Every structure is written in C-alpha cells, then in structure tokens.
A protein has these predicted regions:
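M16 family metallopeptidases and their MPP-like homologs
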Residues: 1-11, 17-18, 35-128, 159-184, ...
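Short, conserved secondary-structure transition motifs
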Residues: 146-154, 243-257, 360-372, 560-564, ...
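Proteolytic maturation boundary segments
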Residues: 216-256, 262, 297, 359, ...
Length: 916
C-alpha cells in the first residue's frame, strides 16, 4: 500500500476532482513503460496538453466541439505509440490481487496484495511508477471518470452525503468541493494543473509505503531507500482554513430521490488526533455496537424504527458524528429524528455506567485481535494513523487510552459538540430534479497495442525471484472428526489466541422451507424463559460474545464466537434461546410489518432491482428471489409458527463445527452436556414446500435459451445496467484450470480483454466484466455472464462492444502467459488459514471435489495450457450463444425499439421479479 497525504481537500478550487483523476492516471505508465516510442509519443502529448488548455478557456459550443475533435484525432495518433495497461500486466505477472486505488478528502491510496517473493520486483515497479508518470490515453480515461460521476448522480446516498458535508463545512473544502468534482470542472480538465498538483504533493515527505506480511523489514527499508532515492523532499504548503463558526441551532434540509426515505443527522467534531476523537468513538459504541447499545436495544430491538445506526468519520482537520434511521410504515422522518436524538440525550445526561464502558472495551479488544491477524487490516490501520498525523504507537494504544477516560469527559464532550449545532438531512421519496449528466463526447476508440511490450517491461519480467512452492493442505487430516452423540464434531484447534468460533450446521435451508427466513430476525427480538431480549443481548456483549442465525440454500447455521473463558456460558444461553424462545405475537406482528416495509423499500433500490432481475433472467419466474412467502402468507404468520420451526431444529441432522483453544475432548463434553442433540440424525419433519420427493438442487431450473431474449425493468436513472447470461455445461472439477485461466485472460481484472476493450480503448463504461461462473452446487450448470454499467447514450455502443468480445476472442500469447503465471504465483503463495479449514472442507465435500487445497491437479495443469486452449474454450462455451440480457434503465432514455435490437423483449414489473 502506498499512501499519499493529499486528496480532494487539496484540489484547486478551479479544478475539483483533480486528485481523483490523477489517481486514475497513475496506472498509465511513464516515459519508460506504457510507450512504444517515447520520442514520437511525447510531441503528440504536448499538442494534446495545449489543446486542453485552449478548450478550458473556450466557451463557444461550436469552437469547443472543434477543439475536442482535434483532441480526439491527435489522441488516436498518440495512442499508436502507447501500450495500454502495462502497469496492470506487470501486477498480473507478480500474481498481485486487489490491484486498485482510491481517493478521499485527505488521502490518495494505491493498493496491491502481492506474493512475498515478489517484494523486490514490486518495489522496482512502484519506484518507476512514481518517477515520471505520463498523462497518456487521457481523454478515454476521463470518460471513465464521467461514468463514475454519472453513477454518483443516480445515488441518493451520495446526494445526502454531499449535502450534509456542504452544510457542516461552509468554509472548508470538506464541504466546498467533492472528491469526484463538479460536472463543469470534469468537462474542462487541465493537464497542466494535474502535473503541478503531482509535483507539489507526490513527494517523499508526503508519502508512505505501508507493508504487512512475510518479509525482512530492515532489508525492505534499505531497498526502498535505494530505489526511491530519486525523490526529493520539498516543502508542502499546508491547507489553511478558518475555524467553522458554531451555530447553536438545528438546520434541516430535504434531499429528494427515488430511493427509500431516511434521516441523517450530522455533528461537526474535532479531528482524529484529539482526545475528543476517542470520546466520540466511545459514544458511538455506547449508542450502536450492533448488540447492546442504546440504539440497538431501545430503537431496533424494541422495534421503534425500521433500522438505526450511529457512526464517526474522522478526517485530518475535523470529524463528523452521524446518526441515521429509517422510518417504519406510517412514521414521519421528523419522528425518526426525535427518536435518534432521544438516545443521544441519554449520553448527554450520563445515563450509562462503568459496566457498559467495560463491555465496550472488552469487545474492542476482541475486535482488534481479529483485525490485526489480517495483513490488509494492519495496513489500513497504519495508513489511517499516517494520514491523520497520529504516531502509530499512539494509535495502537488507543484502547489503553480509552480505558483511562472518565465518564465526566465523555458527558462533557457530548454536551459541547453533540448539541443543537447540527445538520439534519431528510431523504424524501420523489422525483428529483433532472441531474446534469455529462454527455458522451464524440470520441473514437484508441489503439491499445496489447501485443507489444516496452523494453522496461521486458527487463522487469526477466528479473529473478525466489521460487516458492504451494503448501498443500489435506482438509480431512487437519480437521479432526468424532461423533458427539449422533452429531459429527469438526474440530480445529486455535493456537494463535483465546477466541473460539462454534457453529451448529443444520441440513435444512431456505430452499426447504420459505418460513425459515423469519427465524433470524425473530430471534434478534425475543428472549427466553427468565431472560428478556435485552438481557440476552447484554449478557453476550458483556462476555464479548456474539450469536448469529443465518440461512443458506440447503443448510442453516447457528453460531457463537467470543473468548474461551465464556464458552460454556455462551453455549448454555444460546441453547436456552433455541429451545425455549418466547412466543410473542406483538413482536411477530410488528416484525411482519417491518419486513413488508423493507420489501417496499427494496423495490426502490436499483441494486436490489438488478439482483432480482438477474435471478429472473437466469431461472425464469420460479427462482431463488421469488421463492419467498407472499405478502398475504407473511401477514398470516404467527409467533408460534416461528417458534415451532426453531424448536424443531433439535431434530434436524447437523454437525458441530469448533475452532478454538479448548481441547477436543473438552469441547465434546461441553456439547454433550449443554447442547440439545437429536435422538438420531433424522431429517426435519416439517413439510417441504414443494413435496418431499423433490431435491433442493432441482428446485430451480436454469432456463435453456434457444434464442436471444431481453428482460427489462424500468428505473429512473442516468445509467443503464446491462447483464448477459448463458447457461453452460454442468460444473466439473477437472475443468478448474481452463475455466480459471479463461476468466483471468478474458474478463477477470483490469488487464483482461473485456476491461481493456470496453473501458480503456472505447471508454464505454466505468465498470465491466465477463466471467465463466462455476456453479456452487453439485450437478448444477455453470453460467457465462457479463456486465456493463454505462450511460444511456452509450447503450448500443456498450452492448455492441461486449457482444463483439463474446463472439470473437482477441488472441495474445504474451498476455495469456502473464495471466497464467499470475494464477501460478497466487497458488504458490496463498495460504489457507486454520480458521477456514472447516468451511472449506464442507464446500469441497458438498461439491464432490478433492479435499486437498489448493487444487494440486489444477496447479499441475496450468503450465501446460496454451492460448489455443483458451480460444477453443471460448468457441465452445462462449461464442455464438443465444444470450439473455437483463437490463435496468430509464424507459425515457432507452426505448423499446432500442431493446428489441437484441432479442424478444419482456418488460417485467417489480412484483414479478421480487415475488411480492
């Protein structure tokens, strides 16, 4: 991870969005890589620079179009000397995963997860990346940023966030400008301003290389010093701002859009370096720790609101404390606000005691133990400390400092900062004013030269690296099994810490019984004999434990985790809850009403609509999404029905999965003593909805397509979301190597054929992919699927581009070799964690696959694959198929005539795709 301590806060007021699109350009190469002939490319790029400056200062529409045509023309000429995405190709050769970057208010961060034997090559690559970045292929990348902006214009949540910050920070760039930038500024970029920004902020005293993993820190530090020695320290002008004036008055604003209604309340607080930041974190957890906070118990568990949360966003100069809530049916947003503020008032009055703080600190300690096991989490922790100007040792000791904080300080902070000086944003449902989307400029596709390689890349690829062999783990050997009564105990000992994870895994899931979906939400709201729901939540939280009910398609998990010292207590209380749950018809009735409200809200959410439509496109009207209780069936449900279902779990065949420090024999003894086990491992007696003769894997049949078809759902938005689906052959373990290699080459990441053609060359989408998706259930078919999210005015171009790639596969032996080597490198260096053994064993056994991971047959097969194998796979499984398209778009932007070009059109209602 490489963090630069600069973000949108530092954007020039005349070029907002600059930090963000500079982040995009840091993937385009330097004068040494990304170029076929720098001497010929450079003068053309200088011409483009000058044209953009002229374009910026021209207001006449016809002259601007003429200038942009010139930019487009010269860009095509310059692209003949460019090699697109050589950075991503090198990352692929490393075996890197998660290659990405992001920009926020105070930071720009570049991320890679690399094999430990590739650290030296990665440092060579990054040192060159930041030496002299070249702003090539700019106008097509800017189109991707336009798409990102248009996506934000469709998101009600983004509008709320922007309005909140604009009102909280009247004199600070946190509120005066956004990370994505204004439409006007995005349409008038300045390459000169980008270079000036880079030269000012991308300097060694404003950057940090942050690493966590298996390496020698002293050796790496010396290598960093040598390879980045070209960088020169310079003075950086600090961002200067005037302290925001305090206004002891609530100010409220409306944001209107098609998504569900909600309330957001924001308070301006001091920055992350202060003691007040710790107080804010403690108050956040007192209110909302997801188990036993004031909001959790009094608003969510007591069913006063549909949902409610608190949160803190800490930045370099200020922080923001937020409360959010969604109304129940018939509730006003003003009532939601009052309920949220009522819980905050408890903090202001000091209505909490030391035991609550002790429980919070214990749970935070447990959270840190889990978090700091993960390399990525460690890096983000160090990154946050660096960006916010906190010594990492102080940040690491944050918990100890919070233990020393007294109650009076917390109460004083709440009264001083979480008071009337607040902003309330009411997100109301309705038609918003038509967003000023960025229209598609007239540009032409550029050459990518993907079959070419710069001299730098050739030399870099030839750099040696220490070989690492994969570590094969036989899951049947590392997972110890024994019978505990009639149940199988799967056991793995935790030798790292004193935390346990226990799961009861039942052979009964939501595909067996639609009503099963009510168990988890009901059990969060009720208690058991002698214990209220609040009592149970407080007890688990006091112990640092969590319990969860979660449904799968063909199984159901009930789990607990926490410190070993409370294992027996947690097992006992969970079993009490499972076997003696309260029958509360009032809670059940209100739960049903909340589910109905959530269902109505889902129909307003474009992501939920897209997911539902995708299921319909794959399976038809009977699919996993519509496999649900109707609203009428739901309203007839009673608490006694849910309780009967839950009590029946003790008669269902299940396994007991344990990962923790306790010895296996002791775990078995506890389970036999405290957990209700079936007399025999028989199946559940409750009726299977479609008849007991039908197997769950045959419940839903993927549609067999004989002709192209289009399913369409209308949603008022700037973007059009387009999915492709085609049912292929039954999943087969022996095809793992070819399918994985195909995906890596064709559509799996930023260096893939799909991404390079649709986004990089043609600038038709911000997000796009295409993969051959292996089935997750035995004997089920694989699915070829693709996706493009694009502006409605690029609709036909985007579909045409994807269809072209699905029909004919561009061939490049060098790029395929890199893709193949990337997979081999990952298999050699990735390691399965002990806490993952049991879950992996279940998955492999259910699929009928080898229980040794990684798949050593796949590892042996990968080196022998050739480009011709990928071409053959594409011809047989991908090309010429009658794809089903699932499209969510605004019918005023995408007409029926537009849709009918791609097959028989079926417009579906929300009721049809959701099943209610």
């Amino acid at each position: 991870m490489i963090a630069v301590r600069t973000g949108s806060k530092n954007d020039p007021s005349t070029n907002t969005g600059l930090a963000h699109y500079l982040e995009h350009m840091l993937f385009k190469g330097t004068d040494k890589y990304g170029s076929l002939d720098w001497a010929k490319e450079e003068p053309l790029l200088k011409q483009i620079d000058g044209l953009y400056e002229l374009y910026n200062h021209t207001t006449d529409p016809s002259k601007r179009k003429s200038i942009y045509r010139a930019i487009d023309s010269i860009s095509q000429a310059a692209a003949k000397f460019a090699i697109a995405n050589e950075y991503d190709k090198m990352c692929q050769a490393l075996g890197a995963e998660g290659t990405n970057a992001f920009t926020s208010t105070d930071e720009t961060v570049y991320i890679n997860d690399i094999p430990s034997n590739m650290v030296s090559k990665w440092l060579t690559l990054e040192a060159e990346r930041f030496r002299k970045p070249i702003l090539r292929l700019f106008h097509t990348e800017l189109e991707a940023v336009y798409e990102e902006k248009n996506i934000s214009l469709d998101r009600d949540g983004d509008k709320v966030y922007e309005k909140l910050f604009a009102e909280l920070f009247k004199g600070h760039n946190y509120g005066l400008q956004t990370t994505i930038g204004t439409v006007e500024h995005l349409k008038n970029p300045s390459l000169e301003a980008i270079r000036n920004y880079y030269n000012e902020y991308y300097v060694p005293n404003n950057m940090a290389i942050i690493m966590s993993g298996d390496f020698d820190p002293d050796a790496v530090a010396a290598e960093v010093a040598a390879k980045f020695s070209y960088m020169q320290k310079t003075d950086i002008m600090s961002y200067v701002f005037k302290e925001e004036a305090s206004i002891n008055k609530e100010r409220s604003f409306d944001v209107v859009g098609p998504d569900a209604e909600n309330v957001t309340i924001g308070f301006r607080i001091p920055n992350a370096v202060t003691e007040e930041a710790r107080a804010a974190k403690l108050i956040d957890l007192l209110l909302n720790n997801s188990v036993a906070g004031f909001i959790d118990l009094n608003l969510v568990k007591d069913q006063k609101l549909l949902s409610a949360n608190s949160g803190v966003e800490q930045m370099m100069d200020y922080g923001v404390f937020m409360l959010t809530g969604k109304p129940k049916t018939g509730q006003t947003l003003e009532e939601v606000k009052d309920l949220l503020l009522g819980q905050l008032e408890k903090i202001r009055k000091g209505e909490f005691d030391k035991s609550m703080l002790d429980a919070i600190l214990l749970n935070e300690e447990i959270s840190n133990i889990t978090k700091y096991k993960d390399n990525e989490s460690r890096c983000f922790f160090l990154k946050d400390a660096y960006v916010q100007g906190i010594d990492y040792r102080d940040a690491y000791n944050d918990l100890a400092a919070m233990r020393e904080m007294n109650k009076d300080f917390i109460v004083d902070f709440a009264n001083l900062f979480l008071n009337q000086d607040r902003i309330v944003i009411y997100k109301r449902k309705g038609e918003s004013a038509l967003a000023e989307k960025i229209e598609k400029p007239e540009i032409h596709a550029v050459e990518l030269n993907r079959d070419k390689q710069s001299q730098f890349v050739k030399q870099w690829l030839a750099m040696p690296s220490k070989a690492i062999l994969p570590e094969a783990v036989n899951l049947k050997e590392v997972v110890k099994r024994e019978y505990v009564g009639p149940a199988v105990l799967n056991y793995v000992q935790n030798t790292d810490n004193k935390l346990f994870d226990l799961t009861y895994r039942y052979d009964y899931g939501k595909w067996h019984n639609k009503s099963l979906s009510l168990v988890a939400p009901y059990m969060k709201l009720v208690g058991t004999k002698g214990y209220s729901a609040a009592d149970i939540s407080k007890a688990f939280y006091r112990w640092g434990c969590k319990f969860a009910f979660s449904e799968g398609n063909d199984h159901y998990n009930i789990s607990i985790d926490g410190p070993e010292e409370f294992f027996d207590s947690a097992v006992w209380l969970l079993d009490r809850l499972m076997n003696e749950p309260a029958v509360d018809e009032v809670v059940c009735k209100q739960l049903v009403q909340d589910i109905l409200k959530n269902r109505a809200d889902a129909k307003l959410n474009p992501s939920a609509i897209r997911r539902a439509l995708s299921q319909y496109a794959i399976y038809g009207p009977q699919n996993p999404m519509t496999w649900t209780l109707s609203n009428q069936e739901l309203e007839k449900m009673k608490a006694e029905d849910i309780v009967k279902l839950l009590k029946g779990f003790k008669n269902i065949k299940h396994s007991v999965d344990y990962y923790g420090p306790r010895e296996q024999a002791a775990v078995a003894k506890t389970i036999l003593t405290l957990h209700a086990l079936p007399a025999d491992q028989t199946k559940h007696e409750l009726a299977f909805d479609l008849g007991k003769s039908k197997s769950v894997d045959q419940l839903f049949k993927e549609q067999t397509q004989s002709a192209r078809s289009v399913y369409f759902v209308h949603y008022s938005q700037v973007q059009a979301s387009i999915n492709w689906f085609y049912k292929s052959s039954v999943v087969n373990e022996s095809e793992a190597a070819i399918t994985t290699a195909f995906n890596q080459y064709f559509g799996g990441d930023m260096s893939s054929v799909v991404f390079q053609n649709i986004r990089e060359a043609k600038a038709l989408a911000y997000s796009t992919y295409a993969v051959y998706n292996s089935a997750s259930m035995k004997n089920k078919p694989n699915m070829m699927m693709g996706y493009v999210g694009t502006q409605a005015d690029k609709f036909h171009d985007a579909i045409g581009a994807m269809n072209e790639l699905l029909t004919g596969l561009p061939k490049n032996d060098d790029i395929f070799s890199l893709a193949k080597q990337s997979l081999i490198n990952r298999m050699e260096t990735n390691r399965i964690k002990p806490e993952e053994y049991i879950g992996a064993l279940h998955s492999q056994e259910e699929m009928g696959f080898s229980t040794t991971v990684p798949d050593m047959k796949m590892y042996a097969a990968l080196p022998n694959l050739q480009m011709g194998d990928i071409v053959k796979f594409h011809q047989e499984r991908v090309s010429g198929k009658p794809y089903t398209l699932a499209i969510v778009a605004d019918r005023n932007r995408v007409t029926n005539a537009d849709l009918s070009r791609y097959g028989k059109v079926t417009e579906l209602t929300l009721e049809q795709i959701f099943g209610y």
